[in-house]
UniProtKB/Swiss-Prot annotation:
Family per similarity comment: Belongs to the PlsY family.
Name by which UniProt lists this protein: Glycerol-3-phosphate acyltransferase
Source superkingdom: Bacteria
InterPro entries hit by this protein: G3P_acylTferase_PlsY
Keywords, in A-Z order: Cell inner membrane, Cell membrane, Lipid biosynthesis, Lipid metabolism, Membrane, Phospholipid biosynthesis, Phospholipid metabolism, Transferase, Transmembrane, Transmembrane helix
Amino acid sequence: MHILIISISYFLGSLPTGFLFGKFLKNIDLRLTGSGSTGATNVLRNVGKWPAFFVFIIDVGKGLIAVKIAQHYTNQNLFEVLAGIAAISGHIWPIWLKGKGGKAVATGLGMFIALSWKIGFASLGIFLIILAKSKIVSLSSISAAIFLPFLMFLDIGSTNHPYFFISLVVSILVIWKHRTNIRRLLKGEELKINDINK
């Protein structure tokens, strides 16, 4: 059962939401457009606001549902974390798109809302505050990722816990997936959200 749920979590995470929206609405391959990501920000940049909103919600749902399925069948924290990792792995490295997917932000958010709603919504709050001030999605995502392990530590009070471990892994993964954005940020070349679709 555990292996089955992990497999389901991966395939759930690998559903190419953004790619499908790009193909059906604009006949474009998001992997070859903009940042090359299939996540909501690249959908916003190349497809539109409402498609990006729906992609974001669905991608959040992928991480949330994967963990909720695991929680339904077990109360083991480690297994919940493994299901979340599987969903995130599917989102970043989807089998359907030859391993080229998103950047783990929305699916990771869904996972943490399921693991600890306080941490999930606190991270979302940090993202929205930075976005309101900077108007830069990548900077907001990176900032939320940096704070994530600290928020988790404050919540559970231990570094020797699967939740803290996954918060650290996801933090590093999100920052690594944004490495090209970081280079553009340092050069002052990163697009602001109000520059998108102009």
